[in-house]
Amino acid sequence: HVHLVFVTRYRRQIFDYDATEKLRTYFSNVCADFEAELVEMDGEPDHVHLLINYPPKLAISSLVNSLKGVSGRLLRRDRPDIAVRYYYKGVLWSPGYFASSCGGAPISVIRQYIEQQQTPGQVENRALYPRPEGWGFTAHRIKSAI
């Protein structure tokens, strides 16, 4: 499993509930194309978290490039209101991404953390969701081509 985080360009507050649900569909379809599984996905107005189960032969960088590229194009097509206001030179995502191997923490803990992200459009108190216990794994910030 890998935990990925993608941030919007300039950390712009872009995603509402509808956009987040569209992204979930796009990400799930891309994962299926790579014979991977989107286990969990959630986020906030300026970033998304994904938990993906992927085959060992798959290069994470290839998956990330496709996830970011496809989601950016499809969201621009399906939500022109977002594209007009927030896309900078046709780009939705910041160039880098966060990727972390999930071998050091139980998948249930990581899944719980992602589920507890405050989805745009939901009214929840973030103080109710402290960082879960057992949150210990190796993290790498990697710059992508997109």
Placement of each model-derived feature along the sequence:
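Basic nucleic-acid-binding interfaces
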Residues: H1-I146
